[in-house]
Amino acid sequence: MDSIIDLIGRAQQDDGYLYEAHTTGVSANHEHWGGAGMGDRPYSWVVHSHELYNMGHMYEGAVAYWQATGKDKWLRIAEKNARHINHVFFEGDPAYNGGKPVNQAPGHEEIELALVKLFHATGDTLYLNMAKRFIDIRGVTYRPDGDGVMSPSYAQQHLPVRQQTKAVGHAVRATYLYSGMADVMAQTGDTTLRPALDSIWTNIVDTRMHITGGLGAVHGIEGFGPEYLLPNKEAYNETCAAVGNVMFNYRMFMAEKDARYIDVAEVALYNNVLAGVSLSGNRFFYVNPLETDSRQAFNQGVKGRSPWFGTACCPSNIARLIPQIPGMMYAYTDDDIYCTFYAGTSTVIPLKKGKVSLSQQTEYPFGETIRFEISPEGGSGRFALHLRIPTWTGTQFVPGRLYSYAGDSRAAWQLLVNGEEGKAVPEKGFVTVSRTWKRGDRVELRLPMPVRFNRALPQVEADRGRLCVTRGPLVYCAEAV
């Protein structure tokens, strides 16, 4: 990996520019769509080139490598590029755009959330301010006026972000934007972003999400269609959009500590993201329809999973998300621990009054029982443990108005603390045990998983007269029918 980072460093220009397609002249080859899509010179077609998108992924890689190894060479390369972009886009550089600030939001969002990660890694507020500025100017300084992939809504540039109320356009672009907005809201305290985020989230779960957590049902734009247009066989549901759905909802949870966001993220993770990769880890789905047969080459011209794609964002996106999941298992404040995803884990959480060792044993999502062992540093400590009670234990599988169980029976969950039944009422989707904990204390949460039949709202034409089978957080597939 170090040799690859050295190569990246050698490819970077002295001023910080780092987009090899222009540096090497590959962008001049207009026989390929990618060449035309890059523009004829750096930053000349921001609306559709992937210069800032690629740099955002590079920042995330640099931060991840630094976190894993402590080596900062790649991080320094990323910082040099970020300062270059700030100079060119918001100050002006004689070598680019005639010396005028480009002052345009990228056509494919990603750099916004990546800049926030760069801020977390370095503490430099320049990167947080850049993220906010890219969000603030979207739909303000530039709006395309074409159709399809050049329409204003395709890259969420039809309105300033604070005026947007519905999920539109390319689903991956959209979820990356919403993730960046949630990051900026949380880190800057800019609550003017909250109404738009709340409205967009509600619009997604009420009208535009498949029961698998898949987003972006429409081919062509790879994105959101009209409300309730959720076909099964023709669904697009790009794997990257499901990754974006997980990221957006996790960030909304971190901002609001409401379990409904994790409930959506969990459904998307188990039923769409993981469906996008084979058990062997080397074959992939780009698209994830809910219905197919052995004859339909639905997966970018392939009938089943493919070892690779010409545009290989989905395999690399799975490799990007899966290593992040352990870091999403728990969240904490000074005196609170939130258990978000359930899986066998062992961790140490640094609360204000001392560290807490926490282990979790479970066969979830197939097994119904989750067991915790809690051991505060020093032998005892007072804090609150918040355990998620998933939406699927109630009268519907996933938050939103779209889907409900055929039958109103609830799965009665049970909480035991050191073998004694705990009495608590969930608040914002969490049941809370607040007490002075001692080393070796045990908590057991039982989440019954009966097989359930689900129905969609009648507005979803493709699902009329149909039922979907779920158990726990999993959607089940009928094969060879």
Question: What do these predicted ranges mean?
Answer:
Residues 1-481:
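Glycan-recognition and catalytic cores of secretory/periplasmic carbohydrate-active enzymes
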